[in-house]
């Protein structure tokens, strides 16, 4: 339809076309169609009217153009270069004289004149208290910062601001994203080593990781001189600690607790504002049971410690100390009993006013070395910390004894770090300093020498090698006796325990591991026998030896399969002592566990009468009856022999 309306190379505008179509469609009926001839005539008439109007305006336009051309012809000729290539005209510079108002004198006079003018900054800057805390990790300080923000917001009705804290769950979401994409080496989740909280209450909270806190060293930056305050504290203030409740006991440690019963926690220690009762786990401790540290820093404060008698002792001023605290003495003693040496050493400076501070630290190290969790590799560091605290030049008798116990425990764990000779040299130094060396210390070294693996390993079968081990042990014992004035050790030899330990030094350590104080389960294995043990046994009367010492001699003979001295000693016991159930059970157990048929036949056929009492009766109980049954079954599996003894054992077993 567009071609119908083409007139002299022009096309009607869409608006005109729509208007014409609408105009002519309104006059005609829809069935008659569109009258294109009438439309064409109307368009031709409009074109003629337009041309006449243009002819009327032609003289005016020509006059305007003539004026423009005439004006341009009178002006200078148009340059051939464009405006951006033309040469710029030179800029004229004219000097300007301005009076600055400065005097004409020299600069020194000007400086002196300016020095008379004093400028004072009258802006008021309020004092800010700083709380410095440490966290175990970035997640730890993140959680602690969130808890502090919650306490300030919900309990004190303030809106604190923080830096270094991310949005809630930001770390968790980023960590999940890392796991999902498996790009842990390339992606890093939000991390922070320093969190700063403005409480809007006059103090700021800084929470660091341990490394960041040491690097920033914020304590020295905010350390100013201030008046020292004396605080009197009595043991009644810490009555909650004796009841087993764990709350904040000082400004240097938060401990978890059930209820906020500490009087110091009833009000804010910084602002003095009363706290609202709340179930927030951060109020008065960590309710989840996790132990967290939040250290406070106060400039050049005085550390106080409490004695049991109610008095308080002020510590010496230590400007280098950045974490003062108030801790009762019994808490240190409790940590020492638990073997928490790190806790005691971290607060060792707080113990300065106490005379027995070194003894407490040494006791903590001793108990630490006795813990089942302490291993071989923990000994060197513990020994190094011991000698950092222990000073032989000014040590008291309790300190010498406590340090000796620690070294003995260290020797039992790691004889390479603390050999036997080091223990002997320690006692020599103790005696040279004027401190008394008691017999239990000598006996302790003997016991440690016997039970240690420094000189022997289980299963030495060579007699020559075993004699070398015995010589080393005897040399240590001899050196101990001679070094401390016991040349004629009559007192010690009269002691049954010392005799038992000497016998143990001559006996190889076996899988039975029979001790010096308690009789262990007897298990014999064939080992070489040192003849000095036999000489010691024959030189002592049976009456001065108790059952434990006799067990050592019997076990030593059974371990070496030396049955002649074994039954010879049994005859001596039968003549000089009374037979009881313990003695019978010891002999039968050693023979049965030896798994030697020679010992079976000799005991059951010829030496069984040595186990009978004065009336000729064999002491029997269920344990002895069971072992006798095993011996008789090994010798006579068919049950034809030992009919009378079998009848007695069966009666005992089924009675």
Curated annotation (Swiss-Prot):
Which stretches does UniProt call biased (Basic and acidic residues)?
Answer: 44-53
One of the record's GO cellular component terms: mitochondrial inner membrane
Q: Where in the cell is it found?
A: Mitochondrion inner membrane
Renumbered to this chain, region (Disordered) spans: 44-83, 265-296
The annotated regions of Polar residues compositional bias extend over: 54-64
Identify its membrane topology class: Peripheral membrane protein
- Per UniProt, which keywords does this protein have? Membrane, Mitochondrion, Mitochondrion inner membrane, Transit peptide
Q: Which biological process terms from the Gene Ontology are attached to this UniProt entry?
A: mitochondrial gene expression; mRNA stabilization
**What Gene3D superfamilies does the record tag this protein with?**
Beta Polymerase, domain 2
Task: Show the transit peptide stretch.
Answer: 1-24
- Record InterPro entries: Atp25, NT_sf
Q: Which family does it belong to?
A: Belongs to the ATP25 family.
Give the protein's function: Probable mitochondrial mRNA stabilization factor.
Q: Per its UniProt record, what PANTHER family does this chain match?
A: ATPASE SYNTHESIS PROTEIN 25, MITOCHONDRIAL (PTHR28087:SF1)
What's the protein here called? Answer: ATPase synthesis protein 25, mitochondrial
Query: What is the species listed in this Swiss-Prot or TrEMBL entry?
Result: Yarrowia lipolytica (strain CLIB 122 / E 150)
The beginning of the lineage is:
Eukaryota, Fungi, Dikarya, Ascomycota, Saccharomycotina
């Amino acid at each position: 339809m567009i071609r119908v309306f083409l007139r002299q190379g022009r096309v009607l505008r869409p608006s005109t076309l729509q208007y014409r179509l609408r105009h002519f469609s309104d006059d005609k009926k829809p069935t008659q169609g569109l009258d294109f001839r009438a439309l064409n005539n109307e368009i031709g008439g409009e074109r003629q009217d337009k041309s006449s109007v243009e002819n009327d305006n032609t003289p005016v336009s020509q006059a305007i153009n003539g004026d423009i051309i005439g004006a341009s012809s009178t002006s200078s000729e148009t340059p051939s270069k464009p405006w951006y290539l033309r040469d710029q005209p030179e800029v004229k510079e004219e000097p300007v004289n301005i009076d600055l108002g400065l005097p004409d004198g020299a600069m020194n006079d000007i400086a002196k004149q300016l020095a008379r003018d004093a400028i004072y900054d009258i802006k008021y800057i309020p004092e800010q208290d700083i709380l410095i805390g440490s966290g175990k990790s970035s997640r730890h300080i993140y959680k602690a910062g969130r808890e502090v923000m919650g306490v300030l917001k919900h309990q004190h009705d303030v809106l604190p601001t923080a830096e270094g804290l991310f949005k809630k769950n930001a770390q968790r979401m980023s960590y999940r994203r890392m796991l999902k994409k498996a790009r842990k080496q390339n992606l890093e989740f939000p991390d922070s080593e320093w969190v700063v909280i403005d409480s809007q209450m006059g103090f700021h909270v800084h929470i660091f990781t341990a490394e960041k806190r040491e690097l920033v060293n914020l304590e020295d930056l905010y350390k100013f001189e201030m008046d020292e305050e004396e605080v009197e504290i009595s043991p009644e203030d810490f009555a909650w600690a004796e009841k087993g409740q764990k709350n904040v006991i000082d400004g240097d440690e938060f401990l978890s607790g059930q209820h906020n019963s500490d009087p110091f926690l009833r009000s804010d220690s910084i602002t003095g504002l009363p706290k609202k009762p709340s179930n927030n786990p951060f109020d008065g401790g960590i309710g989840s049971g996790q132990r967290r540290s939040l250290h406070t820093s106060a400039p050049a404060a005085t550390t106080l410690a409490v004695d049991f008698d109610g008095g308080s002792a002020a510590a010496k001023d230590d400007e280098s100390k950045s974490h003062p605290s108030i801790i009762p003495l019994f808490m240190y003693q409790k940590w020492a009993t638990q073997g928490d040496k790190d806790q005691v050493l971290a607060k060792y400076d707080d113990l300065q006013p106490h005379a027995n501070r070194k003894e407490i630290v040494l006791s903590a190290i001793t108990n630490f070395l006795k813990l089942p969790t302490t291993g071989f590799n923990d000994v060197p560091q513990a020994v190094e910390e011991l000698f950092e605290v222990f000073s032989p030049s000014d040590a008291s008798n309790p300190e010498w004894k406590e340090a000796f116990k620690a070294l003995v425990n260290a020797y039992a764990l790691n004889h390479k770090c603390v050999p036997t000779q080091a223990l002997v040299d320690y006692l020599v130094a103790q005696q040279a300093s004027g401190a008394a060396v008691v017999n239990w210390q000598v006996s302790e070294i003997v016991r440690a020498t016997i039970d240690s693996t420094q000189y022997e390993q289980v299963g030495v079968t060579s007699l020559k090698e075993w004699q070398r081990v015995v010589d080393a042990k005897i040399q240590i014992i001899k050196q101990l006796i001679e070094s401390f004035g016991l040349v004629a050790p009559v007192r010690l030899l009269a002691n049954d325990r010392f005799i038992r330990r000497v016998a143990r030094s001559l006996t190889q350590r076996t899988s039975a591991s029979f001790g010096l104080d308690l009789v262990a389960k007897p298990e014999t294995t064939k080992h070489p026998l040192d003849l000095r043990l036999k000489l010691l046994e024959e030189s002592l009367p049976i009456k001065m030896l108790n059952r434990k010492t006799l067990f050592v001699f019997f076990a030593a003979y059974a371990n070496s399969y030396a049955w002649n001295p074994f039954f010879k000693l049994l005859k001596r016991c039968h003549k000089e002592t009374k037979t009881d159930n313990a003695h019978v059970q010891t002999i039968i157990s050693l023979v049965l566990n030896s798994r030697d048929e020679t010992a079976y036949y000799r005991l059951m056929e010829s030496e069984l009468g040595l186990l009978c009492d004065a009336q000729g009766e064999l002491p029997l109980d269920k344990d002895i009856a069971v072992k006798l049954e095993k011996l008789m079954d090994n010798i006579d599996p068919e049950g034809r022999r030992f009919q009378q003894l079998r009848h007695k054992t069966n009666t005992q077993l089924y009675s």
